[in-house]
Amino acid sequence: MKQKKDSIIKMKSSEMLYNFLETTQLHKKDFAQMIGVTLSYVYNLIDETIPFSTRSTTLERIATVMDISPEEFVEYKIPQDPILIDETTEFIKEKLKEKKLTTVQFLKSFPRKQRSEIVDILRGARPIPLNWEETSTIAEILDIPKEEIYVHWEARLKQLMQNSGFNFEQNSGLGNAIFSCARNYVEKNN
């Protein structure tokens, strides 16, 4: 009896995934790249050749792309340590809502190799990139002024500098000069 119940559980998650891919007409190859797995893995999940993933990272990535909560998958176990969603992630999600962009539309705007990184940013597992070009690409895709995302990039860089031993109180002049220069660059190149 337990085996029958397990197959119903697998079928439900597999069906959810299959229905999502059909509804959005998202190619399985694109989906695989977005969540950082192989195409054969996606086919195996849908065909139930393998059990649906119980790995929280994979389930969170799948849920992020599907715009659902990972808890909707019965296989998902809530992690002991809660995932903290930072202000930047919330900012990006708000902009997606304002622009009426789905997660899939947003992800398709990025190069294929970068999509799984963006999924990790949206699920709160990765901060925005320190590479300004990558961060400014997010602003371009969201069609917002780069100054709006710059604030989040600056906060991320300050946090990294502090964690690396930079004392902003003792080096306020240098810190102010660094970020004044960066702000000027962003304003001139917007």
Language-model-derived ranges and their functions:
Residues 49-64, 125-140:
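Short, basic-rich loop-to-helix N-cap that marks the start of a DNA-contacting helix
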Residues 46-47, 58, 66, 74-77, ...:
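DNA major-groove recognition helix of helix-turn-helix
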Residues 36-53, 76-78, 112-128:
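Recognition helix of helix-turn-helix/homeodomain-like DNA-binding domains
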Residues 26, 37, 68, 101, ...:
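The short coil/loop that forms the "turn" connecting the two helices of the helix-turn-helix
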Residues 67-83, 140-160:
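Short C-terminal boundary/hinge segments that cap the last helix of small helical domains
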Residues 29, 40, 71, 116, ...:
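Key DNA-contact positions within bacterial/archaeal DNA-binding proteins
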Residues 1-27, 78-105, 157:
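A short, Lys/Arg-rich alpha-helix, primarily the initiator
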Residues 83-109, 140, 153-190:
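Interfacial/linker helices and their anchor residues that mediate assembly or domain coupling
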